[in-house]
Amino acid sequence: IYSPQQITGVSGIDLGDNLFTVSSKDTLNKLKAKLPFIETVKFKRILPDTLKVTVSDAEKYACYKSGDKYYTVSSQGWVLEETSEPSENVFLIISKSAELTVGKAVRYKNENEKQKTQEIIKYLNAQKISIDYIDVSDDIDLKAGVEGRFIAEFGTDSYLEAKIKHLKSMTETIEEGKSGQI
């Protein structure tokens, strides 16, 4: 996605810098702030005077809605871009406490909401249920759009894993073409 010149220019690493004082964490943060579609950065020091930097591209994973904007994030939780329309081929996360800034990790004002989001995603993925959206904006009305045809209403997060296992069995037994709320 980015050229070697872009990466080198933003990294803050200059010719002649001491190989052992270059901070991989600082460099990663600089790169992600300016070039958000970078997922990881690996360093290989080749003595006496070479530092090889390898980056991997971030892929769009999910999309948060905040006001009238959409924020696409990677699977690692880094905000990749801000758009006026949701990205295609990713699921939507509806949250009232997510703080979203391009080039930074998603932050939650409410740690409980973050945990619920992660659990729902984990359990749905474990059951291989296709996610359309997740709504964690109300503690007692958690829900998800799944399989392109169902709205699963979980209520609270009590017994969430069991509820999602039951959801899997229901989606497998309901005939194709039928949709609704579960």
Model-derived features: positions:
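Charged, solvent-exposed interaction patches on well-folded alpha/beta domains
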Residues: 6-18, 25-34, 39-182
